[in-house]
């Protein structure tokens, strides 16, 4: 279900009303088609209103560049799940794929049940797991826990509360790992440490040239990160934005996705020097599968890594350090979403899309 892969959190409201309808386009029913190329006749070539959500006022859509499922948050405080559910990542049982969005029950689908005065405020989706964050700072997780990505020792369905020392305000999920941001601006990670994505570089030598990465089964603080506002996860890298507009990145540097100008991966967070000057601080950062995107305070979109099949920004011409996207140089960019192969942004009151078959 490649069409829903993309982080769609935007600092702006979806409209002046503060809500909108869920639109979907591209390939659907990935459980049947797998990841094979499908014919154009099997894809939605234009945005369509998702029928099962047509009567719901939605304020936020949660998905990612590695997920084949999504969570829709309504203005009434309800959470709807949709898409692949083979590992229980939607928090409900009995179906490997949810063709119709399902509203999560506050008592049946959460353990312990959500408090009467609490609602789901935000969340994140990984490849086979989901995190939901409540307005009171609690974190609930569901799905696969093979590498510890849910912060517990068992696969969870329904959503089960994760033990956290502090209240959480933001979350992000990679393929087999998760990050959460607390009210104090600290970042905690859990899951697989492969490629240094948990910011501590933990690994074990099992031979002269073979490494085995450890797993973190409970939330562990990433000490170098302080005063953090938001985090974002790609396939095997991550980025953090602090309250002053500085950007920190870590993980694998393959295909230049970190934008640090080097092919060396980073096991601990490093600050991007291009955004140190006050005039070039960042307002939002989003990780794609093999790229990183930053919206500067001046509303310019900067990119690093690989996001095209060929040409500038392709595998043979990866962008080594962050640079403005020239196609949008004349527009004010407000937010950006990065999927597996496609990208969208809101610029000058228009939605722009690019990428594979965009």
Where are these regions (language model features)?
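Eukaryote-biased RCC1-like beta-propeller repeat architecture
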Residues: 1-358
């Amino acid at each position: 279900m490649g069409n829903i892969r993309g982080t769609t959190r935007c600092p702006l409201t979806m409209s002046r009303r503060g809500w909108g309808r869920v639109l979907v386009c591209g390939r659907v029913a990935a459980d049947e088609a797998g990841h094979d190329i499908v014919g154009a006749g099997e894809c939605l070539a234009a945005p369509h209103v998702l029928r099962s959500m047509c009567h719901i006022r939605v304020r936020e859509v949660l998905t990612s560049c590695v997920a084949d499922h999504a969570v829709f948050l309504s203005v009434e405080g309800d959470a709807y799940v949709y898409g692949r559910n083979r590992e229980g990542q939607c928090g409900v049982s009995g179906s490997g794929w949810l063709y119709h969005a399902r509203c999560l029950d506050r008592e049946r689908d959460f353990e312990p049940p959500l408090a009467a005065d609490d609602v789901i405020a935000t969340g994140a989706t990984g490849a086979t797991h989901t995190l939901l964050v409540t307005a009171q700072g609690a974190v609930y997780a569901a799905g696969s826990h093979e590498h510890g990505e849910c912060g517990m020792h068992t696969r969870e369905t329904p959503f089960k509360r994760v033990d956290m020392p502090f209240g959480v305000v933001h979350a992000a999920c990679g393929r087999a790992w998760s990050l959460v941001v607390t009210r104090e601006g600290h970042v905690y990670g859990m899951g697989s440490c492969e490629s240094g994505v948990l910011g501590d570089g933990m690994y074990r030598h099992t031979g002269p040239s073979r490494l085995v990465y450890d797993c973190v089964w409970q939330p562990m603080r990433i000490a170098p990160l302080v005063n953090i506002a938001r985090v974002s996860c790609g396939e095997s890298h991550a980025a953090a934005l602090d309250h002053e507009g500085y950007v920190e990145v870590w993980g694998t540097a393959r295909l230049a996705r970190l934008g640090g100008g080097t092919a060396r991966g980073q096991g601990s967070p490093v600050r991007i020097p291009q955004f140190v000057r006050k005039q070039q601080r960042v307002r939002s950062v989003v990780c794609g599968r093999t790229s990183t995107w930053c919206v500067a305070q001046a509303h310019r979109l900067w990119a690093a890594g690989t996001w095209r099949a060929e040409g500038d920004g392709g595998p043979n011409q990866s962008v080594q350090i962050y640079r403005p996207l020239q196609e949008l140089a004349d527009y004010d960019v407000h937010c950006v979403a990065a999927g597996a192969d496609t990208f969208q942004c809101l610029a000058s009151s228009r939605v722009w899309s690019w990428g594979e078959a965009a």
